[in-house]
Amino acid sequence: MAQIQRFFKMGSASGILLFFFALLAIIFANTSLNNFYFNFLDIPVSVQFGEFMINKTLLHWINDGFMAVFFVLVGLEVKREMLEGSLSRYQLAIFPAVAAIGGMIVPALIYYLITNQHPELSNGWAIPMATDIAFALGIVALLGTRVPLPLKVFLLALAIIDDLGAIVVIAVFFSEELSIQALSVAIVAIAGLITLNRMKVGHLCAYLIFGLILWAAVLKSGVHATLAGVIIGFCIPQKDSEGKSPLHTFEHILTPWCSFFVLPLFAFANAGVSLGTINTDMIFSTLPLGIALGLIVGKPLGVFSFSYFSVKLGIAKLPEGIKWKQVFAIAILCGIGFTMSMFLAGLAFTDGQSDSLINTLSRLGILLGSSVSAILGYLLLKSTTK
Protein backbone atom coordinates (compact mmCIF):
# COMPACT_ATOMS: atom_id res chain seq x y z
CA MET A 1 0.00 0.00 0.00
CA ALA A 2 2.84 2.40 0.87
CA GLN A 3 4.46 1.76 -2.53
CA ILE A 4 1.16 2.55 -4.30
CA GLN A 5 0.84 5.82 -2.36
CA ARG A 6 4.43 6.75 -3.25
CA PHE A 7 3.71 6.07 -6.94
CA PHE A 8 0.68 8.39 -7.04
CA LYS A 9 2.72 11.14 -5.35
CA MET A 10 5.37 10.98 -8.09
CA GLY A 11 5.34 13.91 -10.51
CA SER A 12 5.65 11.48 -13.41
CA ALA A 13 2.83 9.16 -12.25
CA SER A 14 0.12 10.60 -14.52
CA GLY A 15 2.38 10.37 -17.57
CA ILE A 16 3.26 6.75 -16.74
CA LEU A 17 -0.44 5.88 -16.37
CA LEU A 18 -1.27 7.51 -19.71
CA PHE A 19 1.45 5.47 -21.40
CA PHE A 20 0.28 2.26 -19.68
CA PHE A 21 -3.38 2.63 -20.68
CA ALA A 22 -2.46 3.61 -24.24
CA LEU A 23 -0.30 0.49 -24.47
CA LEU A 24 -3.15 -1.56 -22.98
CA ALA A 25 -5.51 -0.22 -25.66
CA ILE A 26 -3.05 -1.22 -28.40
CA ILE A 27 -2.78 -4.73 -26.87
CA PHE A 28 -6.58 -5.06 -26.75
CA ALA A 29 -6.89 -3.87 -30.36
CA ASN A 30 -4.34 -6.41 -31.61
CA THR A 31 -5.27 -9.60 -29.78
CA SER A 32 -8.31 -11.85 -29.50
CA LEU A 33 -9.85 -9.03 -27.42
CA ASN A 34 -10.11 -6.88 -30.57
CA ASN A 35 -13.86 -7.36 -31.15
CA PHE A 36 -14.63 -6.95 -27.46
CA TYR A 37 -12.64 -3.68 -27.32
CA PHE A 38 -14.25 -1.97 -30.31
CA ASN A 39 -17.75 -3.34 -29.64
CA PHE A 40 -17.49 -2.21 -26.02
CA LEU A 41 -16.66 1.35 -27.11
CA ASP A 42 -19.59 1.35 -29.55
CA ILE A 43 -22.19 0.30 -26.93
CA PRO A 44 -25.08 2.83 -26.99
CA VAL A 45 -25.81 4.48 -23.64
CA SER A 46 -28.94 6.59 -23.09
CA VAL A 47 -29.86 9.02 -20.33
CA GLN A 48 -33.41 10.39 -20.21
CA PHE A 49 -35.20 13.00 -18.08
CA GLY A 50 -38.81 13.33 -19.23
CA GLU A 51 -38.72 14.24 -22.91
CA PHE A 52 -35.04 15.18 -22.78
CA MET A 53 -32.74 12.34 -23.88
CA ILE A 54 -29.03 11.96 -24.64
CA ASN A 55 -28.17 8.85 -26.66
CA LYS A 56 -24.44 8.35 -27.33
CA THR A 57 -21.99 5.48 -27.71
CA LEU A 58 -19.72 4.79 -24.75
CA LEU A 59 -16.82 6.28 -26.73
CA HIS A 60 -18.74 9.54 -27.18
CA TRP A 61 -19.69 9.62 -23.48
CA ILE A 62 -16.00 9.42 -22.64
CA ASN A 63 -15.02 12.06 -25.21
CA ASP A 64 -17.94 14.45 -24.62
CA GLY A 65 -18.68 13.77 -20.95
CA PHE A 66 -15.56 12.78 -19.05
CA MET A 67 -13.37 15.11 -21.11
CA ALA A 68 -15.69 17.98 -20.18
CA VAL A 69 -14.59 17.36 -16.58
CA PHE A 70 -10.97 17.64 -17.72
CA PHE A 71 -11.78 20.95 -19.42
CA VAL A 72 -13.30 22.24 -16.16
CA LEU A 73 -9.84 21.67 -14.70
CA VAL A 74 -8.25 23.43 -17.69
CA GLY A 75 -10.54 26.43 -17.07
CA LEU A 76 -9.60 26.47 -13.38
CA GLU A 77 -5.86 26.26 -14.16
CA VAL A 78 -6.00 29.00 -16.79
CA LYS A 79 -7.95 31.31 -14.47
CA ARG A 80 -5.53 30.69 -11.57
CA GLU A 81 -2.49 31.36 -13.75
CA MET A 82 -4.09 34.55 -15.14
CA LEU A 83 -4.92 35.85 -11.66
CA GLU A 84 -1.88 34.86 -9.64
CA GLY A 85 0.54 32.73 -11.65
CA SER A 86 2.76 32.64 -14.72
CA LEU A 87 0.21 34.51 -16.89
CA SER A 88 -0.61 37.24 -14.36
CA ARG A 89 1.80 39.85 -15.76
CA TYR A 90 2.68 40.80 -19.33
CA GLN A 91 6.40 40.29 -18.73
CA LEU A 92 5.77 36.75 -17.49
CA ALA A 93 3.20 35.77 -20.11
CA ILE A 94 4.61 37.13 -23.37
CA PHE A 95 7.51 34.65 -23.81
CA PRO A 96 5.44 31.44 -23.48
CA ALA A 97 2.51 33.10 -25.30
CA VAL A 98 4.57 33.84 -28.42
CA ALA A 99 6.11 30.35 -28.23
CA ALA A 100 2.63 28.78 -28.00
CA ILE A 101 1.39 30.76 -31.01
CA GLY A 102 4.33 29.49 -33.06
CA GLY A 103 3.65 25.99 -31.79
CA MET A 104 0.12 26.18 -33.16
CA ILE A 105 0.75 27.91 -36.50
CA VAL A 106 3.74 25.95 -37.84
CA PRO A 107 2.42 22.38 -37.18
CA ALA A 108 -0.90 23.29 -38.82
CA LEU A 109 0.99 24.74 -41.79
CA ILE A 110 3.16 21.62 -42.19
CA TYR A 111 0.05 19.42 -42.02
CA TYR A 112 -1.61 21.56 -44.70
CA LEU A 113 1.43 21.45 -47.00
CA ILE A 114 1.52 17.64 -46.81
CA THR A 115 -2.23 17.00 -47.12
CA ASN A 116 -3.49 19.86 -49.31
CA GLN A 117 -3.96 17.54 -52.32
CA HIS A 118 -6.46 15.49 -50.27
CA PRO A 119 -9.54 17.61 -49.46
CA GLU A 120 -11.06 14.79 -47.37
CA LEU A 121 -8.20 15.32 -44.87
CA SER A 122 -8.51 19.11 -44.66
CA ASN A 123 -10.27 19.06 -41.27
CA GLY A 124 -7.24 17.48 -39.59
CA TRP A 125 -5.05 20.61 -39.60
CA ALA A 126 -5.63 21.21 -35.86
CA ILE A 127 -4.48 17.72 -34.76
CA PRO A 128 -0.71 18.46 -34.52
CA MET A 129 -1.35 21.82 -32.79
CA ALA A 130 -2.01 20.20 -29.41
CA THR A 131 0.31 19.40 -26.49
CA ASP A 132 -0.45 16.75 -23.88
CA ILE A 133 0.57 18.63 -20.74
CA ALA A 134 0.28 15.60 -18.44
CA PHE A 135 2.60 13.50 -20.58
CA ALA A 136 5.10 16.33 -21.21
CA LEU A 137 5.30 17.29 -17.53
CA GLY A 138 5.57 13.60 -16.63
CA ILE A 139 8.72 13.27 -18.76
CA VAL A 140 10.19 16.45 -17.27
CA ALA A 141 9.45 15.05 -13.80
CA LEU A 142 11.56 11.96 -14.61
CA LEU A 143 14.63 14.23 -14.50
CA GLY A 144 13.66 15.60 -11.08
CA THR A 145 15.53 18.64 -9.72
CA ARG A 146 17.95 18.65 -12.66
CA VAL A 147 15.38 20.66 -14.61
CA PRO A 148 15.43 24.38 -13.60
CA LEU A 149 12.16 25.66 -12.12
CA PRO A 150 11.85 28.51 -14.69
CA LEU A 151 11.97 25.87 -17.45
CA LYS A 152 9.11 23.92 -15.85
CA VAL A 153 7.10 27.15 -15.48
CA PHE A 154 7.76 27.94 -19.16
CA LEU A 155 6.43 24.52 -20.23
CA LEU A 156 3.37 24.81 -17.97
CA ALA A 157 2.51 28.34 -19.18
CA LEU A 158 3.08 27.36 -22.82
CA ALA A 159 0.84 24.30 -22.47
CA ILE A 160 -1.91 26.32 -20.77
CA ILE A 161 -1.90 28.88 -23.59
CA ASP A 162 -1.83 25.95 -26.03
CA ASP A 163 -4.99 24.63 -24.34
CA LEU A 164 -6.61 28.04 -24.77
CA GLY A 165 -5.77 27.87 -28.47
CA ALA A 166 -7.34 24.41 -28.67
CA ILE A 167 -10.49 25.74 -26.98
CA VAL A 168 -10.77 28.54 -29.56
CA VAL A 169 -10.24 26.04 -32.40
CA ILE A 170 -12.96 23.73 -31.02
CA ALA A 171 -15.40 26.62 -30.60
CA VAL A 172 -14.81 28.19 -34.02
CA PHE A 173 -14.08 25.27 -36.33
CA PHE A 174 -15.66 22.16 -34.80
CA SER A 175 -19.14 23.33 -33.91
CA GLU A 176 -22.04 21.81 -35.83
CA GLU A 177 -25.32 23.37 -36.99
CA LEU A 178 -26.54 25.39 -34.02
CA SER A 179 -29.79 24.92 -32.10
CA ILE A 180 -31.12 28.31 -30.94
CA GLN A 181 -33.36 26.67 -28.30
CA ALA A 182 -30.46 24.75 -26.73
CA LEU A 183 -28.20 27.82 -26.90
CA SER A 184 -30.86 29.85 -25.09
CA VAL A 185 -30.86 27.33 -22.23
CA ALA A 186 -27.04 27.45 -22.21
CA ILE A 187 -27.10 31.26 -21.93
CA VAL A 188 -29.48 31.06 -18.95
CA ALA A 189 -27.17 28.49 -17.29
CA ILE A 190 -24.14 30.74 -17.90
CA ALA A 191 -26.04 33.68 -16.40
CA GLY A 192 -26.72 31.52 -13.33
CA LEU A 193 -23.02 30.62 -13.01
CA ILE A 194 -21.96 34.27 -13.37
CA THR A 195 -24.52 35.29 -10.73
CA LEU A 196 -23.12 32.69 -8.32
CA ASN A 197 -19.63 34.01 -9.04
CA ARG A 198 -20.61 37.66 -8.48
CA MET A 199 -22.32 36.71 -5.22
CA LYS A 200 -19.11 34.86 -4.22
CA VAL A 201 -21.02 31.67 -3.48
CA GLY A 202 -18.55 29.06 -2.27
CA HIS A 203 -20.72 25.92 -2.35
CA LEU A 204 -19.52 23.87 -5.31
CA CYS A 205 -22.84 21.94 -5.51
CA ALA A 206 -24.56 25.10 -6.76
CA TYR A 207 -22.05 25.36 -9.61
CA LEU A 208 -22.46 21.64 -10.30
CA ILE A 209 -26.23 22.01 -10.85
CA PHE A 210 -25.90 24.92 -13.29
CA GLY A 211 -22.85 23.22 -14.82
CA LEU A 212 -24.77 20.03 -15.65
CA ILE A 213 -27.56 22.09 -17.24
CA LEU A 214 -24.97 24.03 -19.24
CA TRP A 215 -23.19 20.85 -20.38
CA ALA A 216 -26.42 19.19 -21.55
CA ALA A 217 -27.56 22.37 -23.35
CA VAL A 218 -24.21 22.89 -25.07
CA LEU A 219 -24.15 19.20 -26.09
CA LYS A 220 -27.56 19.64 -27.75
CA SER A 221 -26.70 23.06 -29.22
CA GLY A 222 -24.13 21.90 -31.78
CA VAL A 223 -21.22 23.56 -29.96
CA HIS A 224 -18.80 20.97 -28.57
CA ALA A 225 -19.76 20.03 -25.01
CA THR A 226 -16.24 20.31 -23.58
CA LEU A 227 -16.50 24.10 -23.94
CA ALA A 228 -19.07 23.98 -21.14
CA GLY A 229 -16.31 22.64 -18.91
CA VAL A 230 -14.07 25.64 -19.62
CA ILE A 231 -16.90 28.08 -18.88
CA ILE A 232 -17.67 26.32 -15.59
CA GLY A 233 -14.00 26.50 -14.61
CA PHE A 234 -13.83 30.23 -15.34
CA CYS A 235 -16.97 30.88 -13.28
CA ILE A 236 -15.61 29.34 -10.06
CA PRO A 237 -14.61 32.32 -7.84
CA GLN A 238 -11.07 32.83 -6.63
CA LYS A 239 -12.42 33.93 -3.22
CA ASP A 240 -15.86 33.38 -1.70
CA SER A 241 -17.72 35.56 0.82
CA GLU A 242 -15.85 33.87 3.69
CA GLY A 243 -12.41 34.51 2.18
CA LYS A 244 -11.87 30.87 1.20
CA SER A 245 -10.83 29.84 -2.33
CA PRO A 246 -13.36 27.61 -4.14
CA LEU A 247 -11.07 27.81 -7.19
CA HIS A 248 -8.16 26.18 -5.35
CA THR A 249 -10.46 23.71 -3.58
CA PHE A 250 -12.13 22.54 -6.79
CA GLU A 251 -8.79 22.36 -8.61
CA HIS A 252 -7.38 20.27 -5.75
CA ILE A 253 -10.39 17.90 -5.98
CA LEU A 254 -10.34 17.52 -9.77
CA THR A 255 -6.58 17.20 -10.38
CA PRO A 256 -6.15 13.59 -9.14
CA TRP A 257 -9.44 12.49 -10.76
CA CYS A 258 -8.39 13.90 -14.14
CA SER A 259 -4.76 12.73 -13.88
CA PHE A 260 -5.48 9.20 -12.69
CA PHE A 261 -8.93 8.43 -14.12
CA VAL A 262 -10.28 10.73 -16.85
CA LEU A 263 -7.15 11.04 -19.01
CA PRO A 264 -6.08 7.36 -18.68
CA LEU A 265 -9.67 6.33 -19.55
CA PHE A 266 -9.60 8.64 -22.57
CA ALA A 267 -6.23 7.20 -23.63
CA PHE A 268 -7.56 3.65 -23.33
CA ALA A 269 -10.68 4.49 -25.38
CA ASN A 270 -8.85 6.34 -28.15
CA ALA A 271 -5.36 4.83 -28.51
CA GLY A 272 -6.42 1.41 -29.78
CA VAL A 273 -4.79 1.04 -33.20
CA SER A 274 -5.22 -2.28 -35.00
CA LEU A 275 -1.65 -2.88 -36.23
CA GLY A 276 -2.61 -6.01 -38.17
CA THR A 277 -4.16 -3.87 -40.90
CA ILE A 278 -1.18 -1.50 -41.12
CA ASN A 279 1.62 -1.84 -43.67
CA THR A 280 4.58 0.35 -44.63
CA ASP A 281 2.58 2.19 -47.27
CA MET A 282 -0.03 3.16 -44.67
CA ILE A 283 2.62 4.41 -42.21
CA PHE A 284 4.02 6.74 -44.85
CA SER A 285 0.62 7.70 -46.26
CA THR A 286 -0.51 11.30 -46.25
CA LEU A 287 -2.57 11.49 -43.04
CA PRO A 288 -0.18 9.87 -40.52
CA LEU A 289 2.78 11.57 -42.20
CA GLY A 290 1.14 15.00 -41.96
CA ILE A 291 0.28 14.52 -38.29
CA ALA A 292 3.63 12.96 -37.31
CA LEU A 293 5.75 15.59 -39.07
CA GLY A 294 3.51 18.33 -37.70
CA LEU A 295 4.32 17.09 -34.18
CA ILE A 296 7.99 16.09 -34.67
CA VAL A 297 9.08 18.99 -36.90
CA GLY A 298 6.34 21.62 -36.73
CA LYS A 299 6.01 21.88 -32.94
CA PRO A 300 9.71 22.41 -32.10
CA LEU A 301 10.26 24.61 -35.15
CA GLY A 302 7.29 26.81 -34.28
CA VAL A 303 7.89 27.02 -30.52
CA PHE A 304 11.63 27.63 -30.77
CA SER A 305 11.69 30.01 -33.75
CA PHE A 306 8.88 32.22 -32.47
CA SER A 307 10.37 32.40 -28.95
CA TYR A 308 13.90 33.02 -30.30
CA PHE A 309 12.89 35.84 -32.63
CA SER A 310 10.60 37.38 -29.99
CA VAL A 311 13.68 37.81 -27.77
CA LYS A 312 15.89 39.06 -30.62
CA LEU A 313 13.23 41.61 -31.63
CA GLY A 314 12.84 42.81 -28.03
CA ILE A 315 9.24 41.63 -27.71
CA ALA A 316 10.02 39.16 -24.94
CA LYS A 317 12.86 38.30 -22.59
CA LEU A 318 14.47 34.89 -22.02
CA PRO A 319 13.70 33.92 -18.40
CA GLU A 320 16.70 33.84 -16.09
CA GLY A 321 18.24 30.42 -15.54
CA ILE A 322 17.16 29.06 -18.93
CA LYS A 323 19.46 28.24 -21.87
CA TRP A 324 18.37 28.18 -25.50
CA LYS A 325 19.30 24.48 -25.76
CA GLN A 326 16.84 23.79 -22.94
CA VAL A 327 14.14 25.83 -24.67
CA PHE A 328 14.66 23.68 -27.78
CA ALA A 329 14.36 20.50 -25.69
CA ILE A 330 11.06 21.76 -24.25
CA ALA A 331 9.95 22.69 -27.78
CA ILE A 332 10.49 19.07 -28.85
CA LEU A 333 8.51 17.79 -25.84
CA CYS A 334 5.64 20.02 -26.96
CA GLY A 335 5.32 17.64 -29.91
CA ILE A 336 3.75 15.09 -27.54
CA GLY A 337 0.19 15.63 -28.72
CA PHE A 338 -1.16 12.27 -27.54
CA THR A 339 -4.52 12.65 -25.70
CA MET A 340 -5.19 16.24 -26.85
CA SER A 341 -4.32 15.40 -30.47
CA MET A 342 -6.54 12.31 -30.30
CA PHE A 343 -9.33 14.47 -28.93
CA LEU A 344 -9.01 16.92 -31.83
CA ALA A 345 -8.77 14.01 -34.30
CA GLY A 346 -12.07 12.70 -32.97
CA LEU A 347 -13.64 16.09 -33.71
CA ALA A 348 -11.99 16.46 -37.12
CA PHE A 349 -12.99 13.04 -38.46
CA THR A 350 -16.42 12.30 -37.03
CA ASP A 351 -17.74 9.15 -38.68
CA GLY A 352 -18.98 7.61 -35.45
CA GLN A 353 -16.82 4.46 -35.73
CA SER A 354 -14.05 3.82 -33.19
CA ASP A 355 -12.14 1.49 -35.55
CA SER A 356 -12.57 3.20 -38.95
CA LEU A 357 -9.55 3.48 -41.27
CA ILE A 358 -9.26 7.26 -41.01
CA ASN A 359 -9.35 7.06 -37.19
CA THR A 360 -6.73 4.31 -37.27
CA LEU A 361 -4.43 6.36 -39.52
CA SER A 362 -4.83 9.52 -37.45
CA ARG A 363 -4.08 7.62 -34.22
CA LEU A 364 -1.07 6.02 -35.88
CA GLY A 365 0.32 9.44 -36.83
CA ILE A 366 -0.32 10.77 -33.32
CA LEU A 367 1.34 7.79 -31.63
CA LEU A 368 4.37 7.96 -33.94
CA GLY A 369 4.78 11.72 -33.62
CA SER A 370 4.24 11.76 -29.86
CA SER A 371 6.60 8.82 -29.24
CA VAL A 372 9.46 10.29 -31.28
CA SER A 373 8.94 13.71 -29.64
CA ALA A 374 8.96 12.15 -26.16
CA ILE A 375 12.18 10.19 -26.75
CA LEU A 376 14.09 13.01 -28.49
CA GLY A 377 12.86 15.63 -26.01
CA TYR A 378 13.84 13.53 -23.00
CA LEU A 379 17.33 12.76 -24.36
CA LEU A 380 18.05 16.39 -25.26
CA LEU A 381 16.68 17.75 -21.99
CA LYS A 382 18.76 15.21 -20.06
CA SER A 383 21.93 16.24 -21.94
CA THR A 384 21.32 19.97 -21.34
CA THR A 385 20.50 19.75 -17.61
CA LYS A 386 23.57 17.92 -16.28
UniProtKB/Swiss-Prot annotation:
Tell me any Pfam family this protein matches. Na_H_antiport_1
> Can you tell me which residues the record assigns to a coiled coil?
none
* GO BP annotations, alphabetical order: regulation of pH
**Primary place of residence?**
membrane
Show the disulfide pairing. Answer: none
Q: Where are the transmembrane segments?
A: 10-30, 58-78, 94-114, 124-144, 154-174, 176-196, 199-219, 253-273, 283-303, 327-347, 361-381
A single GO cellular-component term on record = plasma membrane
Cell inner membrane as a keyword of this entry, yes or no, is yes
Q: Which UniProt keywords apply?
A: Antiport, Cell inner membrane, Cell membrane, Ion transport, Membrane, Sodium, Sodium transport, Transmembrane, Transmembrane helix, Transport
Q: Which domain of life is it from?
A: Bacteria
Compartments it resides in:
Cell inner membrane
InterPro entries with a match to the protein in the record: Na/H_antiporter_dom_sf, NhaA
What does the record say about its membrane topology?
A: Multi-pass membrane protein
Query: Reaction catalysed by this chain?
Result: Na(+)(in) + 2 H(+)(out) = Na(+)(out) + 2 H(+)(in)
| A GO MF term | sodium:proton antiporter activity
Q: What does this protein do?
A: Na(+)/H(+) antiporter that extrudes sodium in exchange for external protons.
UniProt similarity note: Belongs to the NhaA Na(+)/H(+) (TC 2.A.33) antiporter family.
Instruction: Provide the protein name.
Output: Na(+)/H(+) antiporter NhaA
Q: Which organism is it from?
A: Mannheimia succiniciproducens (strain KCTC 0769BP / MBEL55E)
